[in-house]
Amino acid sequence: MSALPSPSPRPARSQYEDFLRHVRDHGVVKADRTGTGTTSVFGHQMRFDLREGFPLVTTKKVHLKSIVLELLWFLRGDGNATWLQERGVTIWDEWAAPDGDLGPVYGVQWRSWPTPDGGHVDQIAEVVKQLKTNPDSRRIIVSAWNVADLPKMALMPCHAFFQFYVAPGDSPSARGRLSCQLYQRSADIFLGVPFNIASYALLTHMLAQQCDLEVGDFVWTGGDCHIYSNHREQVELQLSRAPRPYPTLQIKRRPPSIFDYAYEDFEIIGYDPHPAIKAPVAV
């Protein structure tokens, strides 16, 4: 088993809530593709030290099952929502065709980026290879933004590009400390961003385990960061609540590869969120 070390008591962190408040107070009113309307700022960054806890938002309950299964679905290289639907996850249903097809979305690009000669690049396998053999590389990058495939996608990638970085580790037994930075070109702060933070933090933990690394930071960088107009009441409710300490993540086993994890391999310990807050998805 591998457990995330954390100080006791764990501190309550408010980067996400501070970000939400900043956009509410300083954003500009903008139109958007969905016709819903937003309050938006351009450019924001948050840094989460994964040694201090697992960054799962506490000012509302976040549906962890959907986060974990969606990440495993991405790692399968899947472009059809059926696998998720069979496991009770409906977060992609609004964009899926009747047969579940979504086109060459995230997982397809991660695992099967097409090359001009008719081949494919498995970007995730390449990340694992580089982390194990060349951890100082500045090219440990995954992109979901395949310009040629964008018209075929049911939804163009919002979280589009991420990079890994290995620093010296704190423990003599570790090969280094793994950090990840995500660039998210479009960020639905109330509904989407809590999922995205947790998803990439989880991926960082998984890769660290597979590559004998400690976890470092997860850095979230956003482009168009927005609150939808029909989320304003929900945002006010969330911002009226005090953040609580982050939980910790325990990975119960080390599977043979990054592609062999199961939902049951993960346990979140000490998650004590405020109640969930429902809001409509802008399609």
From Swiss-Prot:
Domain of life: Bacteria
Active site: 158 (nucleophile)
Protein name per the record: Thymidylate synthase
GO cellular component: cytosol
Gene that specifies this protein: thyA
Function according to Swiss-Prot or TrEMBL: Catalyzes the reductive methylation of 2'-deoxyuridine-5'-monophosphate (dUMP) to 2'-deoxythymidine-5'-monophosphate (dTMP) while utilizing 5,10-methylenetetrahydrofolate (mTHF) as the methyl donor and reductant in the reaction, yielding dihydrofolate (DHF) as a by-product. This enzymatic reaction provides an intracellular de novo source of dTMP, an essential precursor for DNA biosynthesis.
Family: Belongs to the thymidylate synthase family. Bacterial-type ThyA subfamily.
EC class (word): transferase
Pfam families recorded: Thymidylat_synt (PF00303)
Record keywords: Cytoplasm, Methyltransferase, Nucleotide biosynthesis, Transferase
Pathway involvement of the protein, from the record: Pyrimidine metabolism; dTTP biosynthesis
Catalytic activity: dUMP + (6R)-5,10-methylene-5,6,7,8-tetrahydrofolate = 7,8-dihydrofolate + dTMP
GO biological process terms, semicolon-separated: dTMP biosynthetic process; dTTP biosynthetic process; methylation
Gene3D superfamilies documented for this protein: Thymidylate synthase/dCMP hydroxymethylase domain
Subcellular location: Cytoplasm
Primary location recorded for the protein, binned into one broad class: cytoplasm
Subunit note: Homodimer.
CDD domains for the chain: TS_Pyrimidine_HMase
Residues bound to (6R)-5,10-methylene-5,6,7,8-tetrahydrofolate: 63, 188, 282
